[in-house]
Amino acid sequence: MYHVYLLSDATGETVERVARAALTQFRDVDIRLRRMGQIRNREDILRALDEVDRAPGIIFYTLVNTELAQFVRNEVEARQLEAVDLITPLLYKLAEFLEMRPQKLPGLQYEMNSEYYRRMEAVDFTVKQDDGQEPRNLHKADIVLIGVSRSSKTPLSMYLAHKGYKVANVPIIQGIDPPGELEEVEPERVVGLIIDTQRLVDIRSARLRNLRQSPRGSYADYRQVEEELSYCRRFYRAHPAWLVIDVTNKSVEESAAEILSRLHGDIRHD
């Protein structure tokens, strides 16, 4: 049996993928991979190399800290072990090409991957909770946006989702009770959106024109819209712990920044 040791200052997933890719070129060989992650200091290195001494094999390592990488090189030479540094030559070449020094942050790639998947999970959640869908999941949302039709609930939800927040949005419709689950959501997670009457009329009229429909119906009628917004304000006043923001003439980015600023410290990621 041949032993291959994989040393990393992060999880070791990257060095293992590289090793496995190379080993596919050598079939019918009995190889044992031993992954050793979270190598952060000299003591960790010495413990790992002591294990290699007991069952000698080749070492592949990825240590972005150049001092630790040099310590490994010195130790394996002194112990007469076989080792391959998979990342330092690459870092030097990139530093030369980009004319800048690399960030020596162990696990940076893993953290970036984790952040990416967290955001994708937030986007997936938010899409499924759009426009009042699946109200049973409201308690799982980091933020719950509520408001009348065309008050920027969906674009705001998606913008926040791409920042990693799980967002649900619920329409407020005069004459129709919101889902009971809304009352069970922690009030500091609920954000009510309000907008100027004429601005909302203009937005709805433009929407109808885009759909090749007449803007003369009640959906874009000034008095009807005014009644909807009055009902919405009364509903918000009945819940004084909710945050209410005016989105009139604000970009999605501006509204999102205001929400995050005013909710700072109250939002948690589950």
UniProtKB/Swiss-Prot annotation:
User: What does UniProt give as the signal peptide span?
Assistant: none
What's the EC number here? 2.7.11.32, 2.7.4.27
Task: Please report the name of this protein according to its UniProt entry.
Answer: Putative pyruvate, phosphate dikinase regulatory protein
GO MF term (any one) = ATP binding
**Which amino acid positions bind ADP, per UniProt?**
G147, V148, S149, R150, S151, S152, K153, T154
Q: Family membership, please give it.
A: Belongs to the pyruvate, phosphate/water dikinase regulatory protein family. PDRP subfamily.
Which keywords does UniProt give here? Answer: Kinase, Nucleotide-binding, Serine/threonine-protein kinase, Transferase
Query: Cytoplasm: present as a keyword of the record?
Result: no
Annotated source species = Geobacter sp. (strain M21)
Q: What is the lineage of its organism?
A: Bacteria, Pseudomonadati, Thermodesulfobacteriota, Desulfuromonadia, Geobacterales
The reaction(s) annotated as catalysed by this protein in its Swiss-Prot or TrEMBL entry are:
N(tele)-phospho-L-histidyl/L-threonyl-[pyruvate, phosphate dikinase] + ADP = N(tele)-phospho-L-histidyl/O-phospho-L-threonyl-[pyruvate, phosphate dikinase] + AMP + H(+); N(tele)-phospho-L-histidyl/O-phospho-L-threonyl-[pyruvate, phosphate dikinase] + phosphate + H(+) = N(tele)-phospho-L-histidyl/L-threonyl-[pyruvate, phosphate dikinase] + diphosphate
Q: What does this protein do?
A: Bifunctional serine/threonine kinase and phosphorylase involved in the regulation of the pyruvate, phosphate dikinase (PPDK) by catalyzing its phosphorylation/dephosphorylation.
Q: Which InterPro entries match?
A: Kinase-pyrophosphorylase, PPDK_reg
